Amino acid sequence: YQVRYSGLGHASAAMQVRVDFKLPGPKKFTILSETGSGMLRHHVLEPLVKAERQNAVVTSNDGSALVPANYKFRLVAAPDDNGNGKYVLEATPRTSKQRFLFHGTIWLNASDFGIERVQGKLPHSPSFWVKNVTFDYHTQKIGAFWLPATNKTRAHIRFFGHAVLEIRYHDFDLTSIAPVPTAAAAGGRP
């Protein structure tokens, strides 16, 4: 995790975090190192890691999952006849009551429909102090799985300036992986 602030002065902080996960969960977060501004580490990065610990289990029943119950999807672009390009969807929240739903764009891989990128804006400010939150989330395919690659979030801090939070995911170690059965693999329709 890395955060940069500019406004009434400039500051930055970084935190390296190891995340371990084994089914059925939960994820285990271990802070390996911290550098930079103590204020940003204690008031931004540590609460972020704490929130990720609390929200580590995401299911299709979760109020922020990318499912039709939470979003209206509109196809914006599709691959050409040769399979070149991506499926591009516009996502609009079905309700304004869920805190972390977003307005944005989703890019899907043309061959396996994996989510490659999500870019959007939160329709509501998460707090009085934070507004105009935008994000750009990228994934990477490792083996048969789409896993996080980067997440860059920008926000305006009321009266004080701007902050950029960047999370880079790397050094994945996948062991004992069994693909999840799909309806198509079971002889059904997807």
Predicted ranges, named:
Residues 1-103, 111-114, 123-133, 140-145, ...:
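Structured extracytoplasmic
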Residues 146-150:
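Short, positively biased Gly/Pro-containing turn/loop motifs at secondary-structure boundaries
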